[in-house]
Curated annotation (Swiss-Prot):
Subcellular location: Virion
Binding, Zn(2+): 153
Classification via Gene3D superfamilies: 2.60.120.170, Viral capsid alpha domain (1.10.1350.10)
Record keywords: Calcium, Capsid protein, Intermediate capsid protein, Metal-binding, Ubl conjugation, Virion, Zinc
One MF annotation (Gene Ontology) recorded for this entry: host cell surface receptor binding
Lineage: Viruses, Riboviria, Orthornavirae, Duplornaviricota, Resentoviricetes
Any one GO biological process: fusion of virus membrane with host plasma membrane
Protein name: Intermediate capsid protein VP6
Amino acid sequence: MDVLYSLSKTLKDARDKIVEGTLYSNVSDLIQQFNQMIITMNGNEFQTGGIGNLPTRNWSFDFGLLGTTLLNLDANYVETARNTIDYFVDFVDNVCMDEMVRESQRNGIAPQSESLRKLSGIKFKRINFDNSSEYIENWNLQNRRQRTGFTFHKPNIFPYSASFTLNRSQPAHDNLMGTMWLNAGSEIQVAGFDYSCAINAPANIQQFEHIVQLRRVLTTATITLLPDAERFSFPRVINSADGATTWYFNPVILRPNNVEVEFLLNGQIINTYQARFGTIVARNFDTIRLSFQLMRPPNMTPSVAALFPNAQPFEHHATVGLTLRIESAVCESVLADASETMLANVTSVRQEYAIPVGPVFPPGMNWTDLITNYSPSREDNLQRVFTVASIRSMLVK
């Protein structure tokens, strides 16, 4: 894997810097590294593909070295280099695709394609000169079963979940109280509602709670907490739990009271915030507990009192909500996030070449399914294919 990264890094630098008119002295070190790559690869043969509709291709290497010059690189020099670069780039691209479409239930962190296994041989280590990639660093750690650490921006840690619970219901669905939520990606939105605006609740206060368990532990997380849930701020028709009917939700938004968010690890509270909004941080957690209250306004103008009558019908439904968004965090496991395209890269290649469903990943690389059942085998394989996708993205956008 580290050899594949170094090949890709060398080729990217060569493609960017070996251009007509460049002083040879400015790229002499790169050309020496490029020539070392050619010397190491010459005389070797590889085969890629042969799975799904990914075609089988044979690769052989017999290229001349780039020479030295006292002046600028001319057109002939650059054309010779380009022909070599293009062949190598095509080879690396196909090795990456071949690796991205394979999976294994055992030792999925190790190379699975014959071409990458061959590149892992000791003779190719002479190419290895740059392992600065975070993915490569963590792949090497995971390969030795040492602790890894990925930094993510808006990590997709929450499987998609959209539902509701009713703490009070009537057959006519005209006086309901409960909680509804939408968890997806890096965001939780939860709303508590009471059609009667807590008129019969103790002290005219309704208490709500929403608990979310993560599939992986996050550390040093920067989080945004807002006293609102905009996705639940407009009227909607909702299917009943049994699917037999529908009920109408017509929210009027109030500010939540006594808001508390707890971050827990293995059942122990690590961080707690009360009535604090904006940016917060959490040190170490695998569970988030949100609690908040809906308080019936003690003093209301006539127009507000008309919204919340003392008896049915309740045409407007008092609602309070919270939004919690994980902006950045560190995780030992690889995740899809907002700043990278690894999941899309892997999924598109597997779809384009009609790769059959294997023993590890769900059909279509469905992320909700994958993260919901994030087994050690999936974790190993996902880290490997994401690492390869990061290497491929250096050359192929």
